[in-house]
């Protein structure tokens, strides 16, 4: 009899746990994806904070020239970063137990892999949790589809790009200046600014910001008046009220006269679909562009200069971009025996544009 009671108690505890995990009445929904998300994001956050503050220098290039990224080694909030794992490790999975000692693991940049892998699993689980909560509430699943855009971008810079380049040392450092360094080197090696998918991403981000600002300002400027002319319109509303607070017909009429009639939406669902789809599709394309450039399918280049009848170079903006890219690439490649191939294999290139003779 005692054994039977214990089994029922165990089953009841598990059932209670399942109900708590999947309950939509909790202040914060957990969900089964949340069971995976919470520990992975906690592990990534804790390791990131400790590494950002106190990690020793990392031999990122694999040439015994460690690069310091933590605050305790002289960096500040702007210059600090969790430095990517060493080029000597390459694409090998490098958990703590693969190193001979903790010092070796830190020297080869093991914390970077720990943070990135747990972070990626965490954001994948967060996306699944968005779908799970939508499913429990009977909603449509497009929230997690929209979130897939930044997830794809993070996957591109932290996972796909290192795979394509052959080493996690080429991944984006986890810091402010490290992000800028990654962007400069990416431009130097892949000419990302001349890649059409990056252009679509820029249009998506800036266009999305513009449309969001236009929509928000238009809605808050076309309130349905519930007060007299002598009172503020704001007094006619309560936060979270069920009644509609603005008139989309009035907003449509205003915007149609400001631009032209068919530039404005008269259907709220179409409008909000557009507001969601524009930046999401743009960021999808950027992630796709980074993922293709990871395997050196680069942006357009203008390596052939324009020449006049005597064979002299007519310097154009393309030449300026090329020289800037070569300069960034030289600064990046601190390793003498890993000199940029487009410099080492070609004829010498003048560093500056030709200046006219003075006097």
From Swiss-Prot:
Membrane topology qualifier: Multi-pass membrane protein
Cofactor detail note: The D1/D2 heterodimer binds P680, chlorophylls that are the primary electron donor of PSII, and subsequent electron acceptors. It shares a non-heme iron and each subunit binds pheophytin, quinone, additional chlorophylls, carotenoids and lipids. D1 provides most of the ligands for the Mn4-Ca-O5 cluster of the oxygen-evolving complex (OEC). There is also a Cl(-1) ion associated with D1 and D2, which is required for oxygen evolution. The PSII complex binds additional chlorophylls, carotenoids and specific lipids.
Subcellular location: Cellular thylakoid membrane
Keywords: Calcium, Chlorophyll, Chromophore, Electron transport, Herbicide resistance, Iron, Magnesium, Manganese, Membrane, Metal-binding, Oxidoreductase, Photosynthesis, Photosystem II, Thylakoid, Transmembrane, Transmembrane helix, Transport
Sequence positions that bind pheophytin a: 126
Residues the entry annotates as binding a quinone: 215, 264-265
Site (Cleavage): 344-345
GO CC list: photosystem II; plasma membrane-derived thylakoid membrane
Residues marked Stabilizes free radical intermediate (site): 190
Catalyzed reaction equations: 2 a plastoquinone + 4 hnu + 2 H2O = 2 a plastoquinol + O2
More info: Cyanobacteria usually contain more than 2 copies of the psbA gene.
Name of this protein: Photosystem II protein D1 2
Organism annotation: Synechococcus sp. (strain CC9902)
Gene that produces this protein: psbA2
């Amino acid at each position: 009899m005692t054994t039977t009671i214990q089994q029922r108690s165990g089953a009841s505890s598990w059932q209670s746990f399942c109900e708590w995990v999947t309950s939509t009445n909790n202040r914060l929904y957990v969900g089964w994806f949340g069971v995976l998300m919470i520990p992975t994001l906690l592990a990534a956050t804790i390791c990131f904070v400790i590494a950002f503050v106190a990690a020793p220098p990392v031999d990122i290039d694999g040439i015994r020239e460690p690069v310091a990224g933590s605050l305790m080694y002289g960096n500040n909030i702007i210059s600090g970063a969790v430095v990517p794992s060493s080029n000597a490790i390459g694409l090998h999975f490098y958990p703590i137990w693969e190193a001979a000692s903790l010092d070796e693991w830190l020297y080869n940049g093991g914390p970077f892999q720990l943070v990135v892998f747990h972070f990626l699993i965490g954001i994948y689980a967060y996306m699944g949790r968005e779908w799970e909560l939508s499913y429990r509430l009977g909603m449509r699943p497009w929230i997690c589809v929209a979130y897939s855009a930044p997830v794809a971008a993070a996957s591109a810079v932290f996972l796909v790009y290192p795979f394509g380049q052959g080493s996690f040392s080429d991944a984006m450092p986890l810091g402010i200046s490290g992000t800028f360094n990654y962007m400069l080197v990416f431009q130097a090696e892949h000419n990302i600014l001349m890649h059409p998918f990056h252009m679509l991403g820029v249009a998506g981000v800036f266009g999305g910001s513009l449309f969001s600002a236009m929509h928000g300002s238009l809605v808050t400027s076309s309130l349905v008046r519930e007060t007299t002319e002598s009172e503020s319109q704001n007094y006619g509303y309560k936060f979270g009220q069920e009644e509609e607070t603005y008139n989309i017909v009035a907003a449509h009429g205003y915007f149609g006269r400001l631009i032209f009639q068919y530039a404005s939406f008269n259907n709220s669902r179409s409008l909000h679909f557009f507001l969601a789809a524009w930046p999401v599709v743009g960021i999808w394309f950027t992630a796709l562009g980074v993922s293709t450039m990871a395997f050196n399918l680069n942006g357009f280049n203008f390596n052939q200069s324009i020449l006049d009848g005597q064979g002299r170079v007519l310097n154009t903006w393309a030449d300026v971009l090329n020289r800037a890219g070569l300069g960034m690439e030289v600064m990046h490649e601190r390793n003498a025996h890993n000199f940029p191939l487009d410099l080492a294999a070609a004829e010498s290139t003048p560093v500056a544009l030709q200046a006219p003779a003075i006097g």
